[in-house]
Amino acid sequence: MKKNFFLNGLFATAMVGLTLTACSDDEQGNGAGTVGKGEYVIAASVTASGNTTNVLLTSETLNGGTVSTINNGLVNDGATQWVFYKDQYLYGLTYNQGNAGTTRSYFMNANYEVQARSGEYAVKRFTTYGIYDKYIITSSTGDGPTEYADENGYLPKMFLLSYLDVAAETYTTNNTQNKAYMSENFLGNGEFVTLAGILEHNNKIYSAAVPMGLSQYGGKANGGQWILPGNEDLVKTEDGGSNSSSYKKGELQWTQYPNECWVAIFDDETLTTKKLIKTEQISYACGRMKSQYYQTIWSADNGDIYVFSPSYAKTMSDA
């Protein structure tokens, strides 16, 4: 019974983001008073005297009342994304401005109290994440090893993966010396891609392959063969931009194919063997907030896979 309560609570919490303020025992909230500890976990931030503290609270309900931090809650460092692994653990993934971020996990004890597990990891920069088998996997696209530089010194883009083994509390990464992790020309059109979402279905991984345009490496490949006629003026002539919209001289920023949607189906967690599916009925499938690419590919109870797109093709131009 406790296991089911915990499962329901975690998934309910995953759908909402709450910022709460501490209250005293005699304060009333939403006409229902202060609720007790329970199977629901709430990632909250409490502000007092100009200082903000991150707290993992538990509650017996999400339907009303006030959740208090008095004798309730575990202070933590906060997280960019909270990921729930089945009915067992809660992971706090931290994105640290393009560098490795600290990640740790938590569990709920028999007294409805959240406790931290011992493992702590500095995972690679990530732009998407998901669960497959015994792993929480994070992914981003970044520069490959110097051994693969072209004659101009440009590095190819590669998939950068992190694997958190939930039960073993271990952390590993992929070997980018393996050319199977090359994201350049991933779709056969010369552009590099990043992945949006990691969905486990029938023991395979489904992920949207989001085309990102031509990197310096891709733009120079075979004398610029991947630059479509008429798009020569889109190639950057100098470095510019900032943060997740920055670019370098020689890049063709953003895709030349906004009217295409690609889904990659990987055989297992290594992401080294794949099948590609394409449609021109929708644009590429992801949600976007700064450097994060959010999953918009989901499975239904009957086993069907649904892919959603914000219709980027309608909003993109050559400007």
PLM regions and their residue ranges:
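Bacterial Sec-dependent N-terminal signal peptides
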Residues: 1-8, 12-42
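Acidic/polar, low-complexity intrinsically disordered N-terminal segments immediately downstream
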Residues: 25-186, 195-210
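Beta-propeller blade signature
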Residues: 57-59, 104-107, 153-169, 221-271, ...
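Secondary-structure boundary elements
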Residues: 167-170, 198-206, 214, 264-277, ...
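Surface-exposed loop and turn segments in beta-propeller and other repeat-based domains
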Residues: 174-191, 270-292, 319
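Short, solvent-exposed beta-strand-terminating loops
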Residues: 207-229
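Extracellular structured ligand-interaction cores
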Residues: 258-263, 292-294, 302
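Long, well-ordered mid-to-C-terminal structural blocks that present hydrophobic/aromatic surfaces
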Residues: 301-319
